[in-house]
Design a protein with these regions (language model features):
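C-terminal catalytic histidine-bearing segment of alpha/beta-hydrolase fold enzymes
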Residues: 190-193, 215-216, 225-300
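The conserved beta1-alpha1 loop
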Residues: 63-67, 171, 194-195, 263
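A domain-start/cap signature at the N-terminus of enzymes
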Residues: 26-61, 74, 87, 115, ...
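Serine-hydrolase catalytic machinery in alpha/beta-hydrolase-like enzymes
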Residues: 32, 36-52, 56-142, 152-155, ...
């Protein structure tokens, strides 16, 4: 009788251990809901840690941001990247946007009324929190996002550039006047996935009553291509009958900017909804994982900060400059000069007459600019 009871207890104990093990395995393979306190609010996020993580190796970190008015719990189902995280060994995070008081407390990354709040510091705090709990590779932190989440992805690439290595906005171009808010400090990988028939985030930009709110896809890519010292003419490859891949590369062949142009595509996340000839999840990871905080891994990078520029006919200094730029002319031939911002807008122009030409550029915002003299283009950097 005792032997029989012992057998029953043993079977129950084994069953209990199997049950506990099953729970632990399921927990390890599922999202973990977490919170942090920031700016007086309790902020939520879901984190997925692959089973291969054991705390002995630094894992890359990828943020995936939901669209405006959405939630992370729904978005992590719609764009589930866990299978990729399992095979590629990275930590995956789906943060929840905060209530926007200027939009009925709907969940927005970018407030409807400018200045209502700024979520960039939240992401910096979130990175710190995750890094305190997990071994993450601080040189390989990436962000992607859909729609308004794509908008926030650009914000992170611009304003948290010291921590974000590469970005992948989907169904969103950049906000207007990027020179006023975007100051990347290192070569940054940028992938966009855009539908040419998107009625929400219009491919050619959004302008209402003469006011530009979002620049076009073309201007978005030129901005980042210029920042990354890439040729502004892209190479084109056909991915499928409905998708074209545009790539912008440096003179040494290092690609920093790519667009997956979905012909006739709408406000979609390809592979989950909309176009099904590509998988946004796979494309995003394959792209961003090629970069770290120093740029394209294995590529000899040309830094955003260049030294004084000297050619056979001109010398331009100091570069970077603070207020004044001097152009030394080495010949008696006078030439016109033009200075554009990185989206091609003319900032100033004039004629080089004397040997030393001093140009007052103190009114310019700190950023990257392009000086054109005859057929030569020279990259300028304005510092604070």
């Amino acid at each position: 009788m005792k032997h029989k009871s012992r057998k029953i207890i043993t079977k129950r104990l084994i069953s209990l251990l199997i049950f506990i093990t099953t729970i632990n395995v399921s927990f390890a393979q599922g999202y973990i809901s977490e919170t942090i306190q920031h700016d007086g609010l309790i902020r939520e996020y879901s984190i997925y840690v692959p089973a291969s993580y054991d705390g002995t190796t630094n894992f890359p970190l990828l943020f995936n941001l939901h669209g405006g008015g959405g939630t992370n719990s729904v978005w992590q189902v719609s764009s589930d990247m866990r299978p990729i995280a399992d095979t590629a060994d990275f930590i995956l995070v789906y943060p929840q946007a905060r209530p926007d008081p200027s939009d009925g407390n709907s969940f927005n990354w970018i407030p409807k009324v400018p200045g209502t709040f700024d979520d960039v510091p939240f992401f910096s705090s979130l990175i710190d929190t995750i890094a305190s709990n997990y071994q993450i590779d601080q040189n390989k932190i990436y962000a992607c996002g859909y729609s308004l989440g794509g908008d926030m992805t650009f914000e992170l690439g611009c304003k948290l550039n010291n921590r974000i290595a590469a970005i992948a906005p989907v169904a969103r171009t950049m906000q207007a006047n990027p020179n006023s808010f975007c100051s990347p400090s290192h070569p940054t990988g940028v992938l966009t996935i855009l539908g040419t028939a998107d009625s929400v985030s219009v491919y050619n930009g959004i302008t209402y009553f003469g006011v530009e709110y979002y620049i076009s896809a073309a201007a978005t890519h030129i901005y980042w291509a210029t920042h990354n010292n890439c040729d502004t003419t892209a190479t084109v490859n056909i991915v499928s009958p409905s998708v074209e891949r545009y790539s912008w590369s440096t003179a040494s062949g290092c690609t920093y900017v790519e667009e997956l142009k979905v012909i006739g595509g709408g406000h979609d996340w390809p592979g989950s909804f909309g176009n099904m000839t590509i998988d946004a999840n796979i494309e995003i990871w394959q792209f961003v994982s090629r970069y770290d905080i120093n740029g394209l891994i294995g590529c000899i990078n040309t830094s955003i900060i260049e030294d004084n520029v000297q050619t056979d006919n001109y010398k331009v200094f100091p570069n970077p400059f603070h207020e004044e730029l001097t152009i030394e002319v080495k010949s008696d031939i006078s030439n016109d000069f033009k200075i554009h911002n990185v989206v091609g807008e003319l900032i100033t122009s004039g004629k080089l007459n004397s040997q030393f030409n001093t140009i007052d550029l103190s009114s310019l915002a700190p950023n990257v600019y392009i000086l054109n003299i005859k057929n030569q283009s020279i990259r300028l950097v304005k510092t604070k």
